[in-house]
């Protein structure tokens, strides 16, 4: 009888030992200050630096901490989520390096009972559709692209360029749905303004930075020495700036190039401050600061108050050029 009682008592103690850590973790997590992560695919780019800094600034103001992590590939994304889980983080904002990582990211977040929202690039499921139940904040990619194409068309008219004498360098990344929507939107606007379809030349890029833009643009420009005037567009301003550097290497005058990017960040500001104008005419500026702040605010309110963020929030942009960049920067708070 006593042996049976001791056996049952031992089992109860073992069960309690197994359960206690889980309960203690839950209590610690409930009492500890809120911690979230902010994961970005290219932590060295000014756009993402601004987003993460805006998240941290909001955290200081509203009493939560932000763990800033660079995640340039899928393996690092999953490792970052594990890292956040071990720190007791309750959620994260993410701009993933590959939108097709959606199901894997969702599964890993579920393992740690973490909420997450996406910013800039919307995650997709195995069928290519937006990942369900994951709030997103980004740009209206097609409309932003339309703005790029319209800005180029307006500047062509201002300079008196004839469509038949102009080539368009379309730097493409069709692996990233957002990139395709942006360049397709720009193409739509150009064609609607009378640009010749046969004068649009594709330049596939491998990376979405300056180097990727340069590497994509240089061989295409070199293959068409008969084209004397060029317009350039892509998914972001870094890529366009890389392409502009390629035109300079081939001694194409800056006055014969109209490059328009998307974002409105540090590299564009530096370009506008150069002593002489370059082929980088402008960029459709969107507030990276607001993207970082608003996506973080959405996540924190979801965690703290149970307020589910909107499923899909789309922001708009404004043309920023050498003439108005300081005013636009102040207006957008970037």
Curated annotation (Swiss-Prot):
Belongs to the bacterial solute-binding protein 2 family. It is found in: Periplasm. One of its GO terms (molecular function) is carbohydrate binding. It comes from the Bacteria. The keyword Aminoacyl-tRNA synthetase does not apply. One of its GO terms (cellular component) is outer membrane-bounded periplasmic space. InterPro entries: AraF, Bact_Solute-Bind_Prot2, Peripla_BP/Lac1_sug-bd_dom, Peripla_BP_I. The complex is composed of two ATP-binding proteins (AraG), two transmembrane proteins (AraH) and a solute-binding protein (AraF). Keywords: Periplasm, Signal, Sugar transport, Transport. It holds the Pfam family Peripla_BP_1. This is ABC transporter L-arabinose-binding periplasmic protein. One of its GO terms (biological process) is L-arabinose transmembrane transport. It comes from Azospirillum brasilense. Part of the ABC transporter complex AraFGH involved in L-arabinose import. Binds with high affinity to L-arabinose. Residues 1-30 form the signal peptide. Coiled coil: none annotated.
